[in-house]
Amino acid sequence: MSCITIRGCSIGEGRPKVIIPIVEHAESRILETAAQFSTLQVDSVEWRVDHFDDPRTPAAVAPCLPKLRVALNDKLLLVTIRTKAEGGELALRHTEYTDLLHTILDTDCADLIDIEFFPAGDDLPALIGDAHTAGAAVVCSSHDFHKTPPRAELVHRMVAMQQAGADLPKVAVMPQSRIDVLELLAATAEMADQHPETPVITMSMGALGAVSRLAGETFGSAMTFANPGQASAPGQVSLDIVNEVLDALHLLVKIGRASCRERVSY
């Protein structure tokens, strides 16, 4: 799996990087929360613009971003407009969605920006190009809150995101069985092993899929979302537990690699 480095944070290398969401409504609470999050053991903070009091008004969204960037200090800022179609709070027409993306990009404040695979449609490559011009890396996302598509479909979708120029393909799906969780993990491993051109972010949602949020270093998911007190998706694990488990698994991976090197040297 390849690696991208933003603000000194190497995504796709070592321990999965941790993202926590801001889902407050008022600007004052958004900035308060950002200041609190800036002191936590996390790599990135996601602003869910669709939860904002006035997300449709560029004159309200744009001024908030520079203040948010300052409040977060050196944490990566991921900006996300989660549409109703993808499980979010905001029903937008296509032009409204792309205009809001450009409003965010024009501020030059986002380190990463989420662009939804299906809502972007044929405009996806151009939107990704615009994001890169603005200096933002692209998380290209697809969500299914009802089911888990077959592994081949998940892989096909993430490869299409890569081909469109995305820096971090992301899929989040809902399992109906333990086999569904394995399907997501298998798709993740296939991407890491056979399509390593970019890191990927994957998760199986709900309590049943929680293991997928913790086992990224083993299976190939480069980032994970944690719950700092308010979850933004089903099955997000609390931040303390995420950090504890990621640290433990990272240590085991390091021990395993060292053991392999010792055996090879005999």
Outline where the language-model segments fall.
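Short beta-strand/loop segment at the start of cytosolic alpha/beta domains
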Residues: 1-7
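Active-site beta->alpha loop and helix N-cap motifs at the rims of alpha/beta catalytic domains
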Residues: 3, 14-133, 137, 142-150
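Short boundary motifs at domain starts and secondary-structure transition points
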Residues: 7-13, 249-253
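Catalytic alpha/beta core domains of metabolic enzymes, predominantly
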Residues: 112, 117-259
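Single conserved hydrophobic/aromatic residue that forms the stacking wall/gate
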Residues: 258, 262-266
